[in-house]
Amino acid sequence: MAGTLLQPVALGTTFAGRVSGQRWKSHGTRRPPSMLAMSLSRPVKMAAFVGLRSVHSFSVTPVTNFRSTVASYRSRRGRRARFVTRSMFERFTEKAIKVIMLAQEEARRLGHNFVGTEQILLGLIGEGTGIAAKVLKSMGINLKDARVEVEKIIGRGNGFVAVEIPFTPRAKRVLELSLEEARQLGHNYIGSEHLLLGLLREGEGVAARVLESLGADPSNIRTQVIRMIGETTEAVGAGVGGGSSGNKMPTLEEYGTNLTKLAEEGKLDPVVGRQPQIERVVQILGRRTKNNPCLIGEPGVGKTAIAEGLAQRISTGDVPETIEGKKVITLDMGLLVAGTKYRGEFEERLKKLMEEIKQSDEIILFIDEVHTLIGAGAAEGAIDAANILKPALARGELQCIGATTLDEYRKHIEKDPALERRFQPVRVPEPTVDETIEILRGLRERYEIHHKLRYTDDALISAAKLSYQYISDRFLPDKAIDLIDEAGSRVRLRHAQVPEEARELDKELKQITKDKNEAVRSQDFEKAGELRDREMELKAQITALIDKSKEMSKAETESGETGPLVNEADIQHIVSSWTGIPVEKVSSDESDKLLKMEETLHQRVIGQDEAVKAISRSIRRARVGLKNPNRPIASFIFAGPTGVGKSELAKALAAYYFGSEEAMIRLDMSEFMERHTVSKLIGSPPGYVGYTEGGQLTEAVRRRPYTVVLFDEIEKAHPDVFNMMLQILEDGRLTDSKGRTVDFKNTLLIMTSNVGSSVIEKGGRKIGFDLDYDEKDSSYSRIKSLVVEEMKQYFRPEFLNRLDEMIVFRQLTKLEVKEIAEIMLKEVFDRLKAKDIDLQVTEKFKERIVDEGFNPSYGARPLRRAIMRLLEDSLAEKMLAGEVKEGDSAIVDVDSEGKVIVLNGQSGLPELSTPAVTV
């Protein structure tokens, strides 16, 4: 912390003693000022370091000043110099540095040209936040009293301060003792607590007299410091006296966490189930050699929980005698590697760790993400952690539990057979829904305490079931636990909000405060006084409302009554917000929307009752939860002639029920006519361009799992596409090029095809031409059977057999074409309204459009061309000529010769052939 020195610092043996006013130990007389000035002009040397450059404000002094100061002190007398390693300086913590800087400031304040033990004591008290400051404060020692005592003992200096403020020999001794104390405690840093321990251990000097004057007991202070840094007085006393810490494990304590201790303190979550896995782990740990289980499973299935469960069993004594009394220590590999700047540091740390484990014989090491051992610490010519640990793992000297995912195990550990044979794999499967419910019940109390609310049984059951059904890219119980956690957070935030009445009063308060300030600026003090009184009144009302709300919540919690409650609806809301799939119960508004779906779709799709009804039935079935959960919502193939509304129906459904036409995933299958383009659906294979981008179909469905998927012109696709779609239609799943399973269970699949168009054209001449209903219906049935036969010849039977329904669209009648014409004309009117032009057309013009646009073989597309030619082209010419401008109204009619005329409604118009109408 205090800086890194690349070379040992050579420090001289001479030392400038205390300044004028203080006796020198080698002389009985005071030193004259000339000698003092001469001695101060020379560099000051000491065994550790001499001091720091003076600063006027500690808070703005960067740490680099401390480093550069320490690094700059080198002895000019190299032969007689004593070398001190860099380890002492680089181990100072930020708080220890602050203590030294404050000690220097105290020396300047008192006018002393030295830093003694008393200044270090004042620095320890003044630092305020460290362990040393807290202990001294608890003993009743404050900075003011300590300063008074220091001045009583040594007085004030003459105010002359040298550029470099040195440490006295006794202060230097305190720093050396603090390093020893840190080592004996097993710490690789020097903090404020170690400086205080060094000060107490020195036992003499001004600081000891100050503490004695203030009534502090040094042994009591030491005991409190030891207690606060987690050690016992006896252990440290033995370490100090004997010079060896015996059974202490400083490296393991620094880089590991004792799970057994956490279990004894009740800080671990309860582990429910997993009995077979825990028993297998215990069996492997009891082996003589290669006693290292490796937990392998998908992310989130509870691998770490098994290690925690073992620690809990050990803490309660519910284990065989072979591992009774052992400690489960989880190793932080990141912390172990961090800071190893020089070659050999990482290996040294790891070897120390292994030695401590071997000597203890009661440690079970748990390494989460055990694959990080491979390559950890490896550099040019260095050995990684896995190779260092291999001998100990094989001989049984080190009991290690590893945990990793299946993918990481395959990528890293299986590639190294020597490491793989040292670990015994323990498969951790994903728990079932019922097991997950039991796990959630076991965790319920912890989450209720954290969120300060209660969970119903229905909430826990729905969390397990809904997460299993709708969240497909994660694993139980992790996703179910996350659901109840976020639902608890949502409910807690909802109940913690300010009451609505208080919010309204707060708005009024802000306005009154603004008006009051304005009145003060305009010197209308009478009005400002009235507003101030109103402001105070509102503040009191808001405070009273908030307090009342808090009291009610507290009373509800204490009485065990209603209070915040997480129910099934809250879980459903979280699932919907995660996935976009509506799983909440159907509201009354949505019920009306679903029941009137046919009517709404017919506003855009004219005719085609069979298709509209089939689509509506499937959506209603899925929304109320009656569909097969392992298949898509529905899968249709729309066959029929071109231009009758097959693609339009899919767009209308997406716009009406899913929010917008953009909510639909549309794939034009004419883009997948060649064999090599088929892979674009699921992603390019490894080694090909586009592998990292994912598939067009799979990525779109992963991002939006609840949607309409339209495969337009399906018969244009390469035959390999149909092979790929078999598992989508049957099981609602597809695996992309990266091996990820994409869920299609909440998609509505629509395929359009023109197969059978020729059959419809030949057999449909009678359809819609003044036939009675029975004749129309029988003709449609006959045509449908012919189209289905033709589709069977084109598509493979296993593909057709997986479809829910094959719907044959009818040819459009002239009456239906007229209705479509009105819809298309309305679109033109809306575009002109944006340009502030009001357009009207006559009935005669409509009939002209229908006559030209009606073609049973081509559907409604000729109608669009007729509107473009007869209406849009004529109108564009008039607008360019300036005859129709913004703000005008235009009327489109047909004259006696059949020509289209556009008349400006602002001028006098001749009598129209038929009344003008708007759509």
Curated annotation (Swiss-Prot):
ATP binds at residues 297-304, 640-647. GO terms for molecular function: ATP binding; ATP hydrolysis activity. It comes from the Eukaryota. It is found in: Plastid, Chloroplast. This is Chaperone protein ClpC2, chloroplastic. Residues 252-499 are annotated as: I. Residues 167-231 are annotated as: Repeat 2. Pfam families: AAA, AAA_2, AAA_lid_9, Clp_N, ClpB_D2-small. The keyword Plastid applies. Residues 1-54 form a transit peptide.
